[in-house]
Amino acid sequence: MRKLYTGAFGLQACLLLTFAGLAQAQDKPKDAYLYVTYFYCDVTQQERADQIFDQLDRSFYDAAFADATITNYGWLAHQTGGKWRRALYNGAPTIQALLDSQKKIGAQIDAKNKKLSDEEGKICNSHDDYIWKAVAGNTVTAARGSAAFSTYYICDSNREKQADALVKQVFAPIYDKLMADGKLKSWGWLEHIVGGEYRRLATMSGADMKTVLEARASVNQALMDNPLGDTFTDICGSHTDYMWEIKYSKP
């Protein structure tokens, strides 16, 4: 049988619980998710895909950002790395909002110019989809630079949360200082929600690739001879690096 609180004590207790719950909700950072499509493209035609994105897709992503359907977006071009040639991302506070935005924007693009959309799809005719959740950093909220370095990790699934804690404890202060010094525009650590084999994503952006690579070298130097850095490597021991040109993005 449930006990019902009555009178002044009951009201006071309820108010305390209410305000405690509100305080916890305010203290807890908002969830942020990214839906990223990594494209395999015809390398002889990939610049045409960039043109189509600018001519057709971009205005709909700008509008979705302006009306808060999405929290950010970006179109990335491969510079160095694996087989992905282009990447398209957009953010939202929930997974359902991500899926809804994908459906809405895709329908708008096809309705505007199905022929051009199909041409884009033929150039980049295969892809891998991932949903990431932000764990640390500001990459889902900050205006990014024109160049990005992303590392996609394969990790020990039993120790992924330990890797997250190490990033917050060891890596975050280094990245934050690089941002404070103007050497980075953004950085982020994200966890896998849906997608392929990669379990964690570390990404940073800057004004240009030279600046980003210098920042990355600073991070590596700061972690040299740090046993916690070695522990992180034990957990996430395999990775693939990509250097991206951020061709279009918001914010």
Give a label for each model feature.
Residues M1-L4:
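Positively charged n-region of N-terminal signal peptides that target proteins for export
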Residues Q24-A111, D118-P251:
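Short S/T/G/P-rich N-terminal loop/turn motif that feeds into the first structured element of a domain
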Residues A8-A20:
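Bacterial N-terminal signal peptides
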